[in-house]
Protein backbone atom coordinates (compact mmCIF):
# COMPACT_ATOMS: atom_id res chain seq x y z
CA UNK A 1 0.00 0.00 0.00
CA UNK A 2 1.45 3.38 -1.02
CA UNK A 3 1.15 6.44 1.21
CA UNK A 4 -1.44 7.84 -1.22
CA UNK A 5 -3.47 4.60 -1.07
CA UNK A 6 -3.32 4.71 2.73
CA UNK A 7 -4.52 8.34 2.62
CA UNK A 8 -7.49 7.31 0.45
CA UNK A 9 -8.33 4.36 2.73
CA UNK A 10 -8.18 6.41 5.91
CA UNK A 11 -9.70 9.69 4.72
CA UNK A 12 -11.79 9.56 1.52
CA UNK A 13 -15.40 8.34 1.50
CA UNK A 14 -17.04 9.60 -1.68
CA UNK A 15 -19.89 9.39 -2.10
CA UNK A 16 -20.55 9.21 1.65
CA UNK A 17 -21.43 5.68 2.77
CA UNK A 18 -25.19 5.61 3.33
CA UNK A 19 -27.14 3.86 6.06
CA UNK A 20 -24.80 4.74 8.90
CA UNK A 21 -26.17 7.46 11.11
CA UNK A 22 -24.22 9.73 13.43
CA UNK A 23 -21.68 8.16 15.73
CA UNK A 24 -22.23 4.71 14.24
CA UNK A 25 -20.72 6.03 10.99
CA UNK A 26 -17.37 6.62 12.73
CA UNK A 27 -17.23 3.26 14.49
CA UNK A 28 -18.16 1.26 11.39
CA UNK A 29 -16.05 3.21 8.90
CA UNK A 30 -12.93 3.27 11.09
CA UNK A 31 -13.17 -0.50 11.54
CA UNK A 32 -14.10 -1.19 7.90
CA UNK A 33 -11.20 0.92 6.61
CA UNK A 34 -8.85 -0.65 9.19
CA UNK A 35 -8.03 2.70 10.78
CA UNK A 36 -8.81 1.02 14.09
CA UNK A 37 -7.95 -2.63 14.58
CA UNK A 38 -8.61 -5.20 17.33
CA UNK A 39 -5.87 -5.18 19.94
CA UNK A 40 -4.57 -1.76 18.89
CA UNK A 41 -5.23 1.57 20.65
CA UNK A 42 -8.10 3.71 19.36
CA UNK A 43 -7.08 6.57 17.09
CA UNK A 44 -7.91 9.86 18.91
CA UNK A 45 -9.46 11.42 15.80
CA UNK A 46 -9.95 10.80 12.10
CA UNK A 47 -11.59 12.82 9.33
CA UNK A 48 -13.39 11.45 6.29
CA UNK A 49 -13.71 13.71 3.25
CA UNK A 50 -16.82 13.25 1.09
CA UNK A 51 -15.32 14.56 -2.14
CA UNK A 52 -13.70 12.93 -5.17
CA UNK A 53 -10.06 11.90 -4.71
CA UNK A 54 -9.21 14.00 -7.79
CA UNK A 55 -10.27 17.15 -5.93
CA UNK A 56 -7.77 16.38 -3.17
CA UNK A 57 -5.05 15.55 -5.71
CA UNK A 58 -5.72 18.94 -7.37
CA UNK A 59 -5.10 20.58 -3.99
CA UNK A 60 -1.45 19.51 -4.26
CA UNK A 61 -1.03 21.91 -7.20
CA UNK A 62 -2.07 24.87 -5.02
CA UNK A 63 0.60 26.95 -3.27
CA UNK A 64 1.68 25.62 0.12
CA UNK A 65 1.29 27.73 3.25
CA UNK A 66 4.18 28.66 5.54
CA UNK A 67 4.07 25.22 7.18
CA UNK A 68 4.14 23.36 3.86
CA UNK A 69 0.48 22.33 3.77
CA UNK A 70 -1.92 22.77 0.87
CA UNK A 71 -5.56 23.80 1.46
CA UNK A 72 -8.54 23.04 -0.77
CA UNK A 73 -9.80 26.05 -2.72
CA UNK A 74 -13.38 25.49 -1.55
CA UNK A 75 -14.93 23.91 1.56
CA UNK A 76 -15.80 20.20 1.36
CA UNK A 77 -18.29 18.03 3.20
CA UNK A 78 -16.46 16.07 5.88
CA UNK A 79 -17.21 13.86 8.86
CA UNK A 80 -14.92 14.51 11.82
CA UNK A 81 -14.67 11.55 14.20
CA UNK A 82 -13.31 12.24 17.68
CA UNK A 83 -12.77 9.67 20.41
CA UNK A 84 -15.16 10.08 23.33
CA UNK A 85 -13.66 10.31 26.79
CA UNK A 86 -10.05 10.08 25.67
CA UNK A 87 -9.60 6.40 26.57
CA UNK A 88 -7.60 4.83 23.75
CA UNK A 89 -8.39 1.25 24.79
CA UNK A 90 -11.05 -0.57 22.72
CA UNK A 91 -13.95 -0.55 22.35
CA UNK A 92 -13.54 2.76 20.55
CA UNK A 93 -16.48 5.16 20.96
CA UNK A 94 -16.50 8.16 18.65
CA UNK A 95 -18.45 11.38 18.32
CA UNK A 96 -19.27 12.36 14.72
CA UNK A 97 -19.61 15.90 13.41
CA UNK A 98 -20.73 16.79 9.90
CA UNK A 99 -18.85 19.88 8.74
CA UNK A 100 -18.28 21.93 5.59
CA UNK A 101 -14.59 22.88 5.86
CA UNK A 102 -11.46 23.48 3.83
CA UNK A 103 -9.11 20.50 4.05
CA UNK A 104 -5.32 20.83 4.63
CA UNK A 105 -3.05 18.13 3.27
CA UNK A 106 0.63 17.44 2.84
CA UNK A 107 1.67 16.11 -0.55
CA UNK A 108 4.40 13.86 -1.89
CA UNK A 109 5.11 13.64 -5.62
CA UNK A 110 1.91 15.55 -6.37
CA UNK A 111 -0.37 13.29 -4.30
CA UNK A 112 -1.95 13.89 -0.87
CA UNK A 113 -0.40 11.62 1.75
CA UNK A 114 -1.43 13.22 5.07
CA UNK A 115 -4.56 15.03 6.23
CA UNK A 116 -3.17 17.82 8.40
CA UNK A 117 -6.51 19.25 9.50
CA UNK A 118 -9.51 21.26 8.43
CA UNK A 119 -10.56 24.88 8.83
CA UNK A 120 -13.78 26.82 8.39
CA UNK A 121 -12.43 29.61 6.17
Swiss-Prot record:
It is found in: Secreted. Disulfide bonds join 26-81, 42-92, 60-107. It comes from the Eukaryota. GO terms for molecular function: endonuclease activity; nucleic acid binding; RNA nuclease activity. SUPFAM superfamilies: RNase A-like. PROSITE patterns: RNASE_PANCREATIC. Its EC number is 3.1.27.-. Gene3D superfamilies: Ribonuclease A-like domain. Substrate binds at residues 6, 9, 43-47, 82. One of its GO terms (biological process) is defense response to Gram-positive bacterium. Keywords: Disulfide bond, Endonuclease, Hydrolase, Nuclease, Secreted. The active site is at residues 11, 114. It is an enzyme of class 3 (hydrolase). Pyrimidine-specific nuclease with preference for C. This is Ribonuclease CL2. The lineage of its organism: Eukaryota, Metazoa, Chordata, Craniata, Vertebrata.
Amino acid sequence: ETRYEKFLRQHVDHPRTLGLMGHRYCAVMLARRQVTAPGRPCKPSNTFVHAPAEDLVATCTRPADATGFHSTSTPMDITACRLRGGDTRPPCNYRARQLHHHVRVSCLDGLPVHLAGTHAS
